[in-house]
Amino acid sequence: LQASTDERGNVTLTPDERASLAANLKGYDISPDMVRLSLVNMYLHGFSDPHIYEYDTLTSLERWNEYADVILANPPFMSPKGGIRPHNRFSVQSKRSEVLFVDYMAEHLTPAGRAGIIVPEGIIFQSGTAYKQLRKMLVENALVAVISLPAGVFNPYSGVKTSILILDKARAKKVDSIAFFKVESDGFGLGAQRREIEQNDLPEILGLVREWLDLGIHEKLAEHPRVVVASKAQIAENGEYNLSGERYRNAELRITNYEWVKLGDIALVKPQYGSGASKVPYDNKVRYVRIT
């Protein structure tokens, strides 16, 4: 669609292209109200025969054998009390809806399929068995990038910290690394009012993600302060498959043309009291010091 959109945001698809798009777009939702709203939205945008279905992907097998080239999803973050009672076709056994939804989408991509999925932080680092199994499956088969969003981007509806998982099954087979991107501001304040502000990282991060998907690792990415690239072996090292990018940042990475020097060679070190703590003796291992 982006390639067929003019400067004013109007879609310039031909009738045949629009018909092909309409025939290949599908949507599922468990809520009949959301299905009706989605159908009306499609009608208003000129799609006379939209394929939006009332369907529970977690407990029904009716459409299990349907696959997609591209999936975009913002699944529910919360599981109902008592958990989900899913069918037994999932590769990861869990009663947590956030685990099952991601599993479902990863399993229902075609061999060259791609997906963008918004997930709560539990998917990123929870240590439960199902979470680790899910992350292992994603790292080994489909995950190519993780975009960390600031807490509050969904205010006032939810203050949950979220990330976006980028899946690309074809690319995942060709590369042995995963890129992590950090968005600090999306152009709006993170309070309940979400007022527009000047700082907006999204255009830059979007460009970096595209470069990663098109070109792989290069100097600009490697040295960017909000990008971390980790090997799959590194992520799998302790069996946790943690998807927090900062965990893999090289603390010794030097983005400078100057040599490292010892602090004591260029400044007088004076151990002092700090934050109400007791006096720290200087033993060449002082972490917090004042310098002159």
Indicate where each model-derived feature is located.
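Low-complexity, Lys/Gly-biased intrinsically disordered segments
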Residues: 74, 259-292
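Conserved S-adenosyl-L-methionine
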Residues: 1-73, 78-80, 89, 95, ...
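Short hydrophobic/aromatic beta-strand or adjacent loop that forms the aromatic wall/cage
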Residues: 160-164, 192, 248
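Conserved Class I SAM-dependent methyltransferase catalytic core
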Residues: 30-37, 52, 95-167
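Short, well-ordered beta-strand micro-motif
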Residues: 166-168, 182, 290
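Short, intrinsically disordered, charge-balanced linker/junction segments flanking boundaries
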Residues: 198-212, 247, 281, 285-292
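Conserved nucleotide-binding/hydrolysis micro-motifs of P-loop NTPases
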Residues: 76-79, 121-124, 153-154, 170-173, ...
